């Protein structure tokens, strides 16, 4: 049984074809610069294996339909293809940013589901239109193959009102659905399940704090296997300091800057989403570059790192208070899985919470879930590699099998 996973962006499209029996990736790729003069398609056969083979094409892709037509050609190519024809695809799983309150779990795509995605375009103006385009392309190119939408916001729909409501006039929520939705939910859900397996506990008995740290960063407080709070809000801008996003700031800064700097609404939005965070403080948004700069004595890089770590530590404390009991703090995503320096600094002086790191275990690289806590640590400190594509594929199968 094969599931094609699609993550469509405004000018890009990521995909993976996964064999669900082995959970192996048959092929994966990324189409970039869709709609530009020259596009790029990087396609990998048997990625991350000894037999990996890469095909790179540079040509115009006028739209998502033409881009995915080329992907289908590669997947079913007589010589290099991984399946004979499209009939070998059981389902298509789509990553969708925002499903609001209406969609609380993964759903088979129909006109109602597409309508909900359209309704939330004002809150997800970059992602929801692109996600919808990916769905419509799949319907055109794979007639008869069911599509399933897996939403970033699903996992956080179990938050209580005290956590998801903003202290604004309640009418704004009632009229416009202004509330915290949370994102990276597919990743948080995947690592929550993996953590329960690793700890040998039933899912509905685990209390954990999950830290998804990449270029985008978010954390979730998980009580009895369900999300009760998260750092991102109505958009992915709220919460932690990120690669180019500011995270939590005083909202009054925005009108102040618009008045004093003459910024438009769009310019203020760009400032906070694309010119802030690590990049805004030190000019770099790749943590590897920041570490290298810190080694050379770059004070701005050190400040950016300190600010990044400090925000994470604060939220661990806040979520610990919200949960009351914590079985594990879980690190995942690019920085969370690979950056032992960030993990060490986050866990430093956290004895009051029963969190202590084993310095040597922390430095070990592995693609498997692992506990890097010291023996005297009362709380497990786990590194759990995320796999959002596999989680989307599994969700698609579960929906269709009922």
From Swiss-Prot:
Alphabetical list of InterPro entries matching this protein: Ac/propionate_kinase (IPR004372), Aliphatic_acid_kin_short-chain (IPR000890), Aliphatic_acid_kinase_CS (IPR023865), ATPase_NBD (IPR043129)
UniProt-listed NCBIfam families: ackA
Protein residues bound to substrate: 95
Gene name of the record: ackA
Cofactor(s) demanded: Mg(2+); Mn(2+)
Primary location class: cytoplasm
Known catalytic reactions: acetate + ATP = acetyl phosphate + ADP
Name of the featured protein: Acetate kinase
A Gene Ontology term for the protein's cellular component: cytoplasm
Subcellular location per the Swiss-Prot or TrEMBL entry: Cytoplasm
GO MF term (any one): acetate kinase activity
Single GO biological process annotation from the record: acetyl-CoA biosynthetic process
Pfam family, one: Acetate_kinase
Enzyme class: transferase
Keywords for the protein's UniProt record, in alphabetical order: ATP-binding, Cytoplasm, Kinase, Magnesium, Metal-binding, Nucleotide-binding, Transferase
PANTHER family according to UniProt: ACETATE KINASE, ACETATE KINASE-RELATED
HAMAP family linked to this entry: Acetate_kinase (MF_00020)
Binding site for Mg(2+): 7, 388
List of catalytic residues: 152
Binding site for ATP: 14, 212-216, 286-288, 334-338
Cofactor binding, per record: Mg(2+). Can also accept Mn(2+).
Recorded family membership: Belongs to the acetokinase family.
Its biological purpose: Catalyzes the formation of acetyl phosphate from acetate and ATP. Can also catalyze the reverse reaction.
Site entry: Transition state stabilizer: 184, 245
Alphabetized CDD domains for the sequence: ASKHA_NBD_AcK_PK (cd24010)
Assembly mode: Homodimer.
